[in-house]
Amino acid sequence: MKKIICSFFLVAFSLTSFSQGNVIVQKSSKYNDLALTPPMGWNSWNTFETNIDENLVKETADIMVASGMAAAGYTYIVLDDGWMAKERDANGNLVPDPIKFPSGMKSLVEYIHAKGLKFGLYNCAGTHTCAGYPGTRGYEYQDARFYANLNIDFLKYDWCNTEGINAKEAYNTMSNALKTAGKPIVFSLCEWGDNQPWDWGKPVGNLWRISGDIYPCFDCEFKHEQGNWSSWGFMKIIEMRKNIRKFSGPDHWNDFDMLEVGNGMTNNEDRAHFTMWSMMSSPLIAGNDFRKMSKETLAILSNKELIAVNQDKLGIQGFKYSAKDGLEIWVKPLSDGNWVITFLNRSDVTKKIYFDWKKEVIRDVDFNIEANFDTTVYKIIDLWKNKELGNTKKNIYF
C-alpha cells in the first residue's frame, strides 16, 4: 500500500553559527494582493462536472461553515463548467441557467457572501467551454463587466476550443478586461501548462495550472475514451514539471489542480495527496461532495498544521531532497527559518526510515536557503499526529 509515512516540522531552538540572513523573502508583483497565500476553497467539477444547481452550492457553503472548514481557511466556492445556458442572450450576454439557478446568480452570490465566503465562476478562452457552453472568445470585456456586476471574487479561465489563439495574448486580454471592469477578481489561468504559463503568467493572473486534469489515484494515467487526452494521478502531476518552483510565490502560484481527497483513494493516499499539495504551496481547492464527507476526509482537509505549511507567508514551493528504493524525502523552507520534511513512500511495501541528521545539509539553491543539522538543533513535530518527537540530536529510525 502506498502511503505517507510522516511529515515533520523542524523548529530551530538552539543556534550555533547559524544565520537567518540567508532567508530571502520573495518579492512578487501584485494584482491587488488578492492571493498572497495559495487560495483555498471548493470547486464543483471533480465530483459533479456539469450536474450543478443552486441547492448544491448553498448546501456546500453551509457545510463549509458548519464543519469548521471556513474557519480553517477555505474561502472560495467556485462553480465550474455548466452554470450558464447553452446560448447567450440577444445582446451577447452570458445567461445563468434558469433551471439550475432559478433564484438567479446574483442572489446566489449574495448568499455566499452572507456566509463570509467568496464566490467564483468558470469560463474559457475559446469559442466554447470544455463542456460546450458559450466561451469568452470575442466577449472578454463584456463578460468581465458581467462578472463585476455579479460581484464575484474568482474566475477560473480554461483553455478548450482555442484553435489559432495565442495563449499569452488570450490570458492577457482577459486579465486586462477584468481590471478594466473595476472589480478585483482572483484570476486562475487554467491553461494546462502547454504554453509554459509560469514564464509569462506572473503579471497576468494569480495562479496557473501546470498540467492537465487530476484523477483520483496515487500515480496513474487515466486515458479518456473520447479525445486524445489523459488525466493524471497526483504524483504524476508533481513529477510532470521540472524546475518551475522558482516561478511560484505570493500572488502567483503554480496550481497543481484541485484536490481529490475524499474521492475514492485510500485514507493513506488522501493524506499523501494533501501533504504534497501543502508542501508544493499549491492552491487547496477541495473537489469532493461535502454532503457525503467522512470524518476522516474532514480531518485531512482541516489539518491545521499542514494548512499552515501551505499558507506560510514565504510562499516557497517544496522540492525533492532525495529518493532511494521508493522512499522519497521532500523539504520546504518556511518564513521563520524552520523547515518541513516529508518522508513519502512511493512503493507498495512498508519502508523503514533512518535519517542521520548530522550527515545532512539541505540546500535550497533556488532561494539560497540552508538547513545545517550539524550547527543547528531543531525540535521535531509530527504534523499528522501533532506530537513532539524529540530533536535532531538523535537520528530518526522507525
Q: Each predicted region: which residue ranges?
A:
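Bacterial Sec-dependent N-terminal signal peptides
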Residues: M1-G21
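Glycan-recognition surfaces
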Residues: V186-D289
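N-terminal module-boundary/linker segments of secreted carbohydrate-active enzymes
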Residues: G21-K58, I63, I185, L344
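Intrinsically disordered, low-complexity Pro/Gly/Ser/Thr-rich segments with frequent PxxP/GP/PP motifs
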Residues: K385-F398
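Structural recognition of the beta-strand scaffold that forms the well-ordered cores
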Residues: P38-S44, G73-L79, K118-N123, D153-D158, ...
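Catalytic cores of secreted or luminal carbohydrate-active enzymes
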Residues: R271-S322
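Aromatic-lined carbohydrate-binding/catalytic grooves of carbohydrate-active enzymes
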Residues: T60, M64-G164
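Carbohydrate-binding surface patches
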Residues: W277-M280, I285-G287, A323-I369
